């Protein structure tokens, strides 16, 4: 492996929530980065150009996942590829085919460029969606979502991520590409980009009053900085292989709103569950041991949620209360 300072890596979908942090940390570590975006001149990618080291070592390449030639040009000459780009939608036509074809195109372009490794950003959606799994089963890298269940419930995002990951494994095996996959859960944390992405919107709606109640359901969370660091760890660790579940905690939505209301009592955070007739859903068990074994230390979920809200305030997506002192944070693990 060449020294980091000599390495050129490609990050697809560089303007995204996870990818922006990935680009930031790669630049800080001394990598030269090629980031693919649909339009390098779009103001929404301006935050990337402002990153430390961007002027010297970041190139934004115009590319589309469905345009093989554009990907080929971006990846040619790279040592590694981080494939984070993906549609985020429950429209089957916009999700499934672009995710699968785009992933195959990236793997093929990586094979042609003879890159050292591809790190593919999959999702918990490719792992968790299985109604027949025993509640006591520990969710880990051996688990896969049930495709029929995803289709029948019209959960096209999870279905698309699952079939895209399967396509990545098949294509990588056929083309001889060293592929490692990361499966993050719902990603929270500070925003680098100017827009609010879908995962952070999940928290924002609890603070703006648009959500009057919280669901009787559970959600797994992880900090965006940890996800970015995990990508780099999987790229830099020669013995890394297979899939890696990236999760810090599983919380009931009631626990989430309780944490938020303690930190930010000035916001109209819901206090009632939308479903009081059924028993409270219990958090599922999961294992993040594979990433811990590589040395990743996870940010506690309370700290992550606090930093998410502070970022939403700083970016102007959430009004900042004026008549309140800053809370003293005592974050318990």
UniProtKB/Swiss-Prot annotation:
Record's comment on post-translational modification: The formation of a reversible disulfide bond reduces activity by perturbing the positioning of nearby catalytic residues.
Tissues with expression: Expressed in flowers, leaves and stems.
Keywords in alphabetical order: Cytoplasm, Disulfide bond, Lignin biosynthesis, NADP, Nucleotide-binding, Oxidoreductase, Phenylpropanoid metabolism
pH-linked activity: Optimum pH is 6.
Major subcellular site: cytoplasm
EC number: 1.2.1.44
Any one cellular-component term (Gene Ontology): cytoplasm
Catalytic residues as annotated in Swiss-Prot or TrEMBL: 161
Superkingdom in the source lineage: Eukaryota
EC category: oxidoreductase
Means of activity regulation: Inhibited by sodium iodide-mediated oxidation.
UniProt-listed GO biological process terms: circadian rhythm; green leaf volatile biosynthetic process; lignin biosynthetic process; phenylpropanoid biosynthetic process
Disulfide-bond pairs as recorded: 150-158
A molecular-function term among this protein's GO annotations: oxidoreductase activity, acting on the CH-OH group of donors, NAD or NADP as acceptor
PANTHER family the UniProt entry points to: CINNAMOYL-COA REDUCTASE 1, NAD DEPENDENT EPIMERASE/DEHYDRATASE
Similarity section: Belongs to the NAD(P)-dependent epimerase/dehydratase family. Dihydroflavonol-4-reductase subfamily.
This protein's name: Cinnamoyl-CoA reductase 1
Classification lineage: Eukaryota, Viridiplantae, Streptophyta, Embryophyta, Tracheophyta
Protein's gene: CCR1
